[in-house]
Amino acid sequence: MPEADALVVWVSSDHLSEAVAQYGDATGGGLRAAVASGAFTGKACDVAVFPCVRADWHVSHVVCVGAGPAGDVDAERVRRLAAVGAHACRRQRAPRVAWVDAALGALHDAQRLDLLAEGIALANFDGGFYKTRDERTPFLTDITVLTSAPDADTALRRGSIVGESANAARVLINEPGNYLWPERLMEAAGTLASVPGITVEVLGPQRLKDLGMGMLLGVGQGSAHPPHMLVARYTPEGVTGGPVLGLVGKGVTFDTGGISLKPADGMDRMKDDMGGGATVTAALRTLALLKAPVRALAIVPAAENMPGSRALKPGDVLKSAAGLTVEINNTDAEGRLILGDALWYARQLGATHLVDVATLTGACIVALGKVTTGLFGTPLPWVDAIRAAAARGGEKVWPLPLFDDYKDGLKSDIADIVNSAGRPGGAITAALFLKEFAGTGPWAHLDIAGTVWAEDAKPWMPRGATGAVVRTLVELGHHPLP
């Protein structure tokens, strides 16, 4: 047993007697008493912390994390249990942790350890980086996983990389609008260039104008900070052909709604409107660090949607890089505009399979709440591949329709299409708008409006950015693209 401030053990609700036999004496009878009284039942995500009286263990505390019924444990449960245990250690101010690995559910060893490491990494995060008082809970600094599983180091490294990449996205999403604007987002995402296999290019306003990206430029014209676009490419060593996975992420660094101004209540949350951009750059970073065998690129169109004197107005008409003209009937339907130009450009750069990620519509929250990400796409095998990737990663996505009947709402009297079809079916019509610019070939849209942010703290997740769908995209890039 390594010297540690805390020993973390998982306790299934249907194996309480075994846990008491193994750890009852080491906890000075504390675990035995807690189980006997019903104070600790092994319910999923329950935590009980006891002083350790076994001097030969060199451990200060034993942290018991309830895992629920052993047969009910899935990928998301493991990640949550790991985060709950890590948060408990941080609250205990126990930076050195020894973690006892144990079989859970039907997950194989590598998957379980991968998720364990990711959950710990996600919990070892604090969004209060502008606090000046010493109120932050100490981070975990030394973690030893006690396991006999083969190739454990590989699985633990993979999970740590995924978790740390998701945390990088969470940092950007949590940033206030006065600290993060398009140029700053380019600088932050530009650090991808330090990752082996990734090259980065930043397109400024003049280059965007040369490319005819009237929608992106139009959205940002009311801001003092002009639009930019990040283009990052990952090429695996020795790979010269095959499909190219294109990841496109919405990068509205702050969204007031523009002239179609949002209500003041809740507008502060609109700093998270670049969550899609943060997500795709985090995913690309992870694919490169894990040496995924697929060529990939990440494109982030970045703009600030402000109601300045030069701002886009309802009734204006913009010309897209794809050549389509768009009548603006709602300046708060801006994300689809910048994504449209970016999707077109991704195809020009050779993307064969596209996924865009965006905090796109409140309508998706109405449809699916804040638990499930909305999924749209075509053809069906591509949608199924993304659903399978989400399932492997323990994330929830749900497909919504793209019936042509909904297109009537996008008709314009003076342009090719309008940018908003109104409230009914709003998530669907927004996705249909994007489809106009996605070209031929597989395309999917992930609407993370409800899942990008945790409004209420959970035992496994503090309030703030969540890092949603990073793992889904990473899983997608590690399997053959259909």
Model-predicted segments: where are they?
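Short amphipathic alpha-helical segment within the helicase RecA-like ATPase core
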Residues: 1-244, 248-251
